Amino acid sequence: AFESAWRLSRIHDRHELHELLREDPELCLERRSAPERLFFSLRMQAFARNAIGSLHEAMESIAIDSCTFRSPEIVLILGESYNKHHAALYGYPLPTTPRLSQEEAAGRLYPFTDVVSPANFTVQAFASQDRQTAWCDTPLFPALFRRAGYDTLMFDNQTTFTLENDDVWDQEIRHFLYHPRLSPQLFTHCNADKYPFDEGLLADFDRQDLRFRNPHRLTIFHLMGQHVAYRNRFPAEAGYFTADSIPEYSTSGLRRSRDERRIVADYDNAVRYND
């Protein structure tokens, strides 16, 4: 217990913190006692303040010489908890991605098949073997588009812009991405509401569409996607699979109970709804 606090106390900057968490990713899980939790929180708040300051400086330093706007309308969709092994697009036997598969067949979609990530956790996935730079030392990409003359529209279903929501990931996203010092550098518009299902973002987009006359736009949709609990990620009428749709034995030969197959069916329904 006290070893964790001592190790954290020896860290002087976020680079050392990243190295420590890379070496010992379970470190933060060891803070069981109230004093440990308080100490950890205070240290993390200090590092967060430094990270926000670094991000602000990095984005202030952006210089765009010119932009041809060869792609005037760009849409980026960020999914969540998406496992390609449950996507028919990548060979899954159930029809979880009928629309994506149709787009691929028509030659309008290119599925990547050889992508390697250093981690399955968002921030750690930014790590680069060739460039030992902390993620907060370089500009976030929406700021580049904004500085180049694009309107940057953000429709996010993982956070709200009020203080009533106490979800941990909601607070983390709001603390960095929508920090009052950083958000104006990143986005022309952010949605104000959160929706039970991701299609609510599309209705929100339709309501806002006429407000922005700039022909050059980057629109980002950040979905709740297939985040747990899976049964909450699709409306009842969108249910397509049931426990009976899922094989009793997994591809690795493990027998699945009916409850386990129902959970898999819920996930597959979330994938299909996401599609």
Q: What is the predicted function of each stretch?
A:
Residues 243-266:
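Conserved small/aromatic sequence motifs within transmembrane helices
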Residues 5-251:
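Active-site-proximal alpha/beta segments of enzymes that process anionic O-linked groups
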Residues 75, 269-275:
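Metal-dependent active-site segment of extracytoplasmic phospho-/sulfohydrolases and closely related
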